Amino acid sequence: MNTITGKVWNFGANIDTDVIIAARYLNSSDPEHLAKYVMEDADPEFPKKLKKGDIIVAGENFGCGSSREHAPIALKAAGIAAVVAPSFARIFYRNAFNMGLPIFELPESLEIKEGEEISINLDKGEITNNTTKKTYKFIPIPPFMQELIATGGLINYAKAEMKKAI
């Protein structure tokens, strides 16, 4: 999981958790159910256009609003490989890592346009726009958070740690 490559979908600033997954769908916590409606309020056709491995590149404060783990669950289940933005709401930031959804803070994220392909290299701390050939350095992810991503989230991480202890 050292490199993530995918097609970019752009969304603006202040995309809140109600836009990521609308409250009307929260009667279920089934990831596959939630995936069918991800980002529907921003683009009703988005769930149909999305392909596994695609990457969301958004404006600042992505994931603001209500504290709900349904938002990163829906994104991950829909096949979103990563989210890149200049900043994230702190509770979304933590929920994303807890659910195993990779997110990256990149101040220049708005330079990356929809439809372009990017590669995110965790080892080098770089995002390369394969379309324009421009490379950006992203704000490093702390080692523990990298472990959460590598194991698929906090629950899987805890299970692995418990197995080690036995």
From Swiss-Prot:
| Entry-linked InterPro entries | Aconitase/3IPM_dehydase_swvl, AconitaseA/IPMdHydase_ssu_swvl, IPMI_Swivel, LeuD, LeuD_type2/HacB/DmdB
Parts of the chain that traverse the membrane: none
Q: In which pathway does it act?
A: Amino-acid biosynthesis; L-leucine biosynthesis; L-leucine from 3-methyl-2-oxobutanoate: step 2/4
Task: Write out the entry's keywords from A to Z.
Answer: Amino-acid biosynthesis, Branched-chain amino acid biosynthesis, Leucine biosynthesis, Lyase
Provide the GO MF annotations for this entry. 3-isopropylmalate dehydratase activity
Q: Which reaction does it catalyse?
A: (2R,3S)-3-isopropylmalate = (2S)-2-isopropylmalate
Tell me one GO biological process term.
L-leucine biosynthetic process
Write down the EC number: 4.2.1.33
Top-level division of the source organism's lineage: Bacteria
Query: Which PANTHER family does this chain map to?
Result: 3-ISOPROPYLMALATE DEHYDRATASE SMALL SUBUNIT 1, 3-ISOPROPYLMALATE DEHYDRATASE SMALL SUBUNIT 2-RELATED-RELATED
Q: According to its UniProt entry, what is the function of this protein?
A: Catalyzes the isomerization between 2-isopropylmalate and 3-isopropylmalate, via the formation of 2-isopropylmaleate.
| Quaternary organization | Heterodimer of LeuC and LeuD.
Q: Which family does it belong to?
A: Belongs to the LeuD family. LeuD type 2 subfamily.
Q: What is this protein called?
A: 3-isopropylmalate dehydratase small subunit
